[in-house]
Amino acid sequence: MSMKHLLFLVLFVCSSCTEPNVKDMLGDDFRLYKHTPAWSLAKAVEDEDTTEISKQVLQMHISVDYRDPKYKQTLLMLATRTNKIESVEKLLALGANPNAHDDSTKYFGESAVLSACRFTGPSSKILALLLKYGGDPNSTACGVKENGLGEIVPMREFALSAAVFSSFEKVKLLVDAGANINYETSTANCAIENCMIHGRMDIMLYLLQKGADYRRKFTEIDIDKPDYPTFEVDILYKLRKCVYPIGSKAYKEKMKVVNFLKRKGLDYWKSPIPSGMYGVIMREIAPKNKADFDYYIKHY
């Protein structure tokens, strides 16, 4: 091998071994802790070595809520995001705070509870453990995020609204733990509105049965006008915008919601079809002819 090729190989190996800078690491990277006193604890959490976790906290006196230098998240939060069930349980048993949140000046300001609900990776068992050890079922982000225009805006997503997207089981755990079913924030929809956005009619029916306010108003934006004014609508209007193939699972679940509301005095079948929905139906359902279109309009 020539000296030139040998030098190239050495440089390649060295560059391959170079770890990314902390500022380039994502929030689920245990190496965030590498150059901190909690590195051994972090490795034990990653490996789910509960004996070593206990040793690091009880004998080496490493704070169970030690925060990483970038996101200021605790190891409980990191263990939650990476679905380390045994580590989560051990950290909680050692006193880790399930309601501690990460940096709220640069990042979302979310707790382990909210992370467990926002991501699909963490299992329902992890959320159950967090709630068992005092996690707030109404956990709400208190940080910031970047919107579509590149502006920094408040982040106020909360556990129940987030769980609608990730897991029915997590929704049930939160409700059983006392979550406010009608909770909403300045930047996050109430849970039943998220159900309609994400097509989770099954979860919507469950929340309605548990006491969700079906007479509340929802805010819509009139995109056909230049100043995009807002206006209020009822739940029937919102349901009219939920378009599913007739006979599909989502359609059948929607009809259960429709029947529930009918028993409460709200007749979906007498509600007008919002303007613009005919075009949506043509695009999403693609009826073959006018007869199919008319049938769908009558039954959707």
Model-identified regions with their sequence ranges:
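Ankyrin-repeat intra-repeat helix-capping/turn positions
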Residues: 48, 83, 120-122, 166-167, ...
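Bacterial signal peptide processing site
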Residues: 18-20
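C-terminal motif of bacterial Sec signal peptides marking the signal peptidase cleavage site
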Residues: 13-16
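Ankyrin-repeat boundary/"N-cap" motif
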Residues: 31-43, 66-77, 101-118, 140-162, ...
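Conserved ankyrin/ankyrin-like repeat signature
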Residues: 52, 86-87, 122-126, 169-170, ...
